[in-house]
Amino acid sequence: MDFKYSDTVIHNGVVFYITDGGHRVYFLYGGCLLSVPRPHATAESGEIAKFGLTLRGLTHNDRVVANYVRSELNRTGRHESAPSSEEDVFVDRLEVLAQGAQAFGRDICGSFDLEVYDPYLAECMVSLKVTSGLIVSTGRDIPQDGMLHLYTVPTITNASSGFIYTPNIACFTLVQAYLTELPPELETLISGLFDRIPVARPPLRDESGGHSRTDIIVTSPRAVKTMAIGGTTRCSKRPLRKTVVSDFVQVRLIPKPCSIWDSASRVASGASLQSLQLLFKIADEIILIEEPWPGLDEHLNQARSTIVDAILAVYGNEGKLRFFGGKLTQQGVTTLQRFVLCQFILGKWNLINCYAALEQLAESYIGAVPEARDPLPDPHLVADAVNEIIRESGILGELCEIIVRYTQPTDPVNGSGSEVVELEARLLAEFAANATRVELGLSSYDEVRNMEARIASVLNKLYAKDGIGGAAQVACRILGSGLPVAIVLNVSSITAFDGLDLSRKGAYYLYYLLSERLKRGGVTVHVSRK
């Protein structure tokens, strides 16, 4: 859910986001977003609204987590902060628990991030025992777009290591609430705020008949749950048998585009190892099963067909086109699993990928076939598999750049004889030359052909299931140097989960070759701007 704003102002130490021509402000309160109108507003535009995630339970049918937070608030003496049994528990109560009895309204304002150090709550949220605490991020501010974005599922990271977990989606629900009044501490906080905010001058001819409505863009087709907090006549008369949205907003449902490709990481899990384990396990099922499973929407079903086209473009029929990760086939890793591993790497580095679509397919499939989730494959085996691919592409990048820098006019090296390898060697020579600012136009024809032949020899070894060791061995021979051995040692230390420069280089070389194969295979990669 996206909230547009035009400007910001700091008042009483809190950032307020101005919208609706100065008639309304947003501010962050414990990871939730409160929308407050200018005093003396009309009944239509004077609604106080609260948007945010609420706590639910371990499954969709229980309220274990919400009840636990209520009991902890009462146990620690925060009775006034404990919602009644009829009300949902917003995530802002987590911040009250974390800060203790001394927490005041201003202390809880200003951030989308919440700290959770209660071991039981942490385990409920990520289905793992966590001793170092969690950081729960409920949204983000995008200043360049003037937009506040609330997540439907939070991003959860380890407070100590920064490890990104897969959230238990049953634990959270996005809710809009109507407030009859603000708590006294927040009333004090905003006192005098609107005296500092000028009202935009209305046009001479106002055809709208009142205040302009504020756009809130709902980016998910699932409706936001609505609830009322308080017992005023106005709220009690509101027909809440169906989901409605505040009178002061205009809701625009933006359907998700059919394109599966994106240039940013938009997965709910943040591309964690846990999500990769699940996708690695069920990749073949979610793509190759012929009939759509119950609950699979049309967009995701179309995505399966697009993914099949992409896999055929990259690996060919029955995987006959060789590519990175060929060594993994000896361990029983399928073509689809290798494709998932590649998309994971591209997503990690915000290169064009379809990992989010794959994860949505997995979530939909598990919703229909829950027994397909367990047991997950060994995390070490999955990590080793994805690390093999990033290391192969990493050593390729390093060796290509050395070859274009230091190739001498010696006897030419025999090429591989493979049309695909020779074509990609020519592309890689140009790509590596651009990366190292080497002017191929200044080299002779024979020197350039020699570069391409040497790159083809390295590429052929990688594609022939010999891995980084085989690539280094042939590179030592054609370069007449032991430098590739040192490169192997460096490459062996990188992983698909780190942020090292060598890992970035591997991701970019992987992306370049994969995108060229998609292009040659007739797969259009259209990135939707969200």
Swiss-Prot record:
Coiled coil: none annotated. Keywords: Host cytoplasm, Host nucleus, Virion, Virion tegument. One of its GO terms (cellular component) is host cell nucleus. Pfam families: Herpes_UL21. It comes from the Viruses. It is found in: Virion tegument; Host cytoplasm; Host nucleus. The keyword Repeat does not apply. Interacts (via C-terminus) with UL16. May participate in DNA packaging/capsid maturation events. Promotes efficient incorporation of tegument proteins UL46, UL49, and US3 homologs into virions. May also play a role in capsid transport to the trans-Golgi network (TGN). This is Tegument protein UL21 homolog. It comes from Equine herpesvirus 1 (strain Ab4p) (EHV-1).
